[in-house]
Amino acid sequence: MTKATDIRTKSADELNEQLLQLKKEQFNLRFQRASGQLENTARVREVRRDIARIKTILGERTRSAQPAS
């Protein structure tokens, strides 16, 4: 599990790369769960929440970069 403070120190490029890796892992976990091969079911939840954390921080950055109108 990645902490929000660790995510905030990374650049946008690093976050997008990590987001892509997490989405690939989520895809693989989904198939493992469907075929009954998934051993660590808690990892599905961790990955989903890590994706949400990264998307939230990226959204905060884009909103703060835009001037208020």
UniProtKB/Swiss-Prot annotation:
What is the official name of this protein in its record?
Large ribosomal subunit protein uL29
- Give the family per the record: Belongs to the universal ribosomal protein uL29 family.
Gene Ontology molecular-function annotations: structural constituent of ribosome
Q: Which Gene3D superfamilies match?
A: 1.10.287.310
Q: Which SUPFAM superfamilies match?
A: Ribosomal protein L29 (L29p) (SSF46561)
Cite the entry's keywords alphabetically.
Ribonucleoprotein, Ribosomal protein
HAMAP family linked: Ribosomal_uL29 (MF_00374)
**PROSITE patterns linked:** RIBOSOMAL_L29
Tell me, which GO biological process terms does this entry list?
A: translation
Highest taxon above the source species: Bacteria
The top of its lineage is: Bacteria, Pseudomonadati, Pseudomonadota, Alphaproteobacteria, Rhodospirillales
Q: Give the Pfam families listed for this entry.
A: Ribosomal_L29
Under the heading InterPro entries, the entry gives:
Ribosomal_protein_uL29 (IPR050063), Ribosomal_uL29 (IPR001854), Ribosomal_uL29_CS (IPR018254), Ribosomal_uL29_sf (IPR036049)
Gene Ontology CC terms, in alphabetical order: cytosolic large ribosomal subunit
Query: Where are the membrane-spanning stretches?
Result: none
